[in-house]
Amino acid sequence: LLGMIPVAITAISALSKL
């Protein structure tokens, strides 16, 4: 699950830029 955390952060950051 810890490996999914950075992925989630990256996805949220990408959505924030839209």
UniProtKB/Swiss-Prot annotation:
Expression across tissues: Expressed by the skin glands.
Keyword Transmembrane helix among record annotations: no
Main location group: secreted
One GO term (biological process): killing of cells of another organism
Record's function text: Antimicrobial peptide with activity against Gram-positive bacteria S.epidermidis ATCC 12228 (MIC=50 uM) and S.aureus (MIC=64 ug/ml and MBC=128 ug/ml). Not active against some Gram-positive bacteria (methicillin-resistant S.aureus (MRSA), E.faecalis), Gram-negative bacterium E.coli ATCC 25922 and fungus C.albicans at concentrations up to 100 uM. Can only slightly inhibit the formation of biofilm by S.aureus (minimal biofilm inhibitionconcentration MBIC=512 ug/ml, minimal biofilm eradication concentration MBEC>512 ug/ml).
Extra remark: The primary structure of this peptide is identical to that of Medusin-PT (AC A0A1M4BLT1).
Name used for this protein in its record: Medusin-TR1
The organism's taxonomic lineage, starting at the top: Eukaryota, Metazoa, Chordata, Craniata, Vertebrata
